Design a protein with these regions (language model features):
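Membrane-embedded segments
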Residues: 3-118, 135
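Short, conserved active-site loop motifs that form the nucleotide-linked donor/cofactor pocket
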Residues: 56, 149, 195
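Residues immediately flanking
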Residues: 23, 127-128
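Short glycine/serine/threonine-biased micro-segments
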Residues: 61, 100-102, 126, 153, ...
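Juxtamembrane amphipathic/hinge helix adjacent to a transmembrane helix
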Residues: 16, 189-196
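VWA/integrin I-like adhesion module and closely mimicked acidic/polar interface patches used
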Residues: 92-96, 110, 119-121, 128-188, ...
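Hydrophobic/aromatic beta-strand patches that form the interior of the parallel beta-sheet core
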Residues: 18, 59, 123, 152-154
Length: 196
């Protein structure tokens, strides 16, 4: 089948925004309902729906990072790709598990660095402490600053313990595991780039 589209050139002075979303297995913890990843996806979807004039893209990361969706004003496509993210992406071996915050930021920076938008922003949604990757989160924040990119950080989860699904020979069992958010690093990342 073929379709034709009538394209219109419109000039919108929007913002270019990359969402950098942690998809590590720790995002399956259920201290937020139904779990951290789904809670983060709900917040991000509301954000996307509230920004109709902005280019928005999506980077996902665990032990490594990749672009799920480049910058686009087609938020329907973006939301479909966003909703397709499943919490077991690292468990299934699609990407290395862990939390490589610096790599997630670096991937998002690479999508924004050449942007001509009046404002360039990364929104980082993560639950944990950096424990993987070749680039530290603070180094990535310095690079973002050099390109005029502001980083806003959102810590997803609580400190303490949380129910976490563990695959066993008998099926999925829930175990309470210690969880924490490295709020100091998230604050430093945002502060370095004049974000929040």
């Amino acid at each position: 089948p073929q379709t034709t589209d009538n394209w219109q050139n419109t000039e919108i002075e929007g913002i270019d925004i990359m969402l950098a979303v942690d998809v590590s297995t720790s995002m399956l913890a259920e201290d937020l309902k139904p779990n951290r990843l789904e809670a983060a996806k709900q917040v991000a979807a509301e954000f996307i729906n509230g920004r109709p004039n902005d280019n928005i893209g999506l980077t996902v990361f665990a032990g490594e990072a990749f672009t799920q969706c480049p910058l686009t004003v087609d938020h329907g496509v973006l939301l479909n790709l966003f909703n397709s993210i499943k919490g077991d992406i690292a468990q299934r071996g699609m990407i290395e598990d862990g939390t490589a915050i610096g790599m997630g930021l670096a991937n998002a920076i690479s999508r924004l660095k050449d942007s001509k938008a009046k404002s360039k922003v990364i929104i980082l949604l993560t639950d944990g402490s950096n424990n993987r990757g070749d680039i530290s989160p603070l180094t990535a924040a310095e690079i973002a600053k050099q390109f005029g990119i502001r980083v806003y950080t959102i810590g997803v989860g609580t400190n303490g313990t949380a129910p976490y699904p563990m695959q066993t020979y008998a099926g999925v069992q829930y175990v309470n595991v210690p969880v924490e958010i490295d709020e100091q690093t998230l604050t430093q990342i945002a502060g370095t780039t004049n974000g929040n």
